[in-house]
A protein has these predicted regions:
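Preference for long, well-ordered alpha-helical segments
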Residues: 134-135, 141, 145-179
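Amphipathic, well-ordered alpha-helical segments in soluble domains
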Residues: 18-28, 56, 90, 145-148
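Alpha-helical scaffold segments that form or flank carboxylate-/histidine-based iron centers
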Residues: 6-11, 34-55, 73-89, 124-141, ...
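Carboxylate-rich helix-loop segments that flank metal/cofactor sites and access channels
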Residues: 103-123
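Helix-adjacent hinge/juxtasegments
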Residues: 67-108
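Extreme N-terminal tail/first-helix region
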Residues: 1-23
């Protein structure tokens, strides 16, 4: 299985860019906005969504050596959920690994488990995937949770860039609609 190195590098860079955005966001928040559930949005906290994002990255990176990534084996580390310092440290560590891991540049088949269905057949096995496919999954998953973080933070009255939590394809679509209207 091969992927052009430039494509693989672009996927890594995209994920690093999302994580740097998360790092800037965490640095801009106070503890209340980061760790408190807005009224009526339980259990949604910015910190809980960020913890979830980071645990997916950890599962992916930790599973590369064995070629078995188990997204269901998340640690659910509450420290990251409530501590901006712990979240920042985890983000920096993941960025470093993404930027330096040789495994990420060697496309190959990997096996992935993620329980998305209430079926014993799904729970028991791993599905075939690839490094580039999982990098794409991580990117999409991150943007999806950024959108939920944006809702949570805006409920707290936090000002965010209007494009925070929007997928690149959505931003391109909106830009094309704006260009058409002009």
């Amino acid at each position: 299985m091969t992927t052009k190195p430039s494509h693989q590098s672009a996927l890594i860079e995209t994920n690093v860019r999302w994580l740097r955005q998360a790092l800037r966001l965490v640095g801009s928040l106070d503890d209340t906005a980061y760790a408190t559930t807005p009224r009526g949005l339980s259990p949604h906290r910015a910190g809980a969504h960020l913890r979830h994002i980071l645990e997916f990255y950890r599962c992916f990176l930790e599973g590369l050596e064995s070629s078995h990534v188990d997204y269901d084996a998340r640690r659910r580390d509450d420290t990251i959920e409530y501590s901006r310092d712990a979240a920042s440290a985890a983000i920096r560590s993941i960025i470093r690994t993404l930027e330096t891991s040789r495994d990420l540049h060697q496309e190959r088949i990997i096996w992935v488990r993620m329980e998305d269905a209430d079926s014993d057949a799904v729970r028991e096995g791993f599905m075939e995937s690839s490094i580039s496919r999982e990098l794409q999954v991580l990117s999409s998953h991150t943007v999806h949770h950024f959108a939920l973080i944006a809702i949570t933070l805006r409920t707290h009255g936090v000002e965010l860039d209007s494009d925070f939590g929007m997928a690149p394809s959505t931003l391109r679509y909106l830009a094309s609609k704006t260009a058409e209207a002009a």
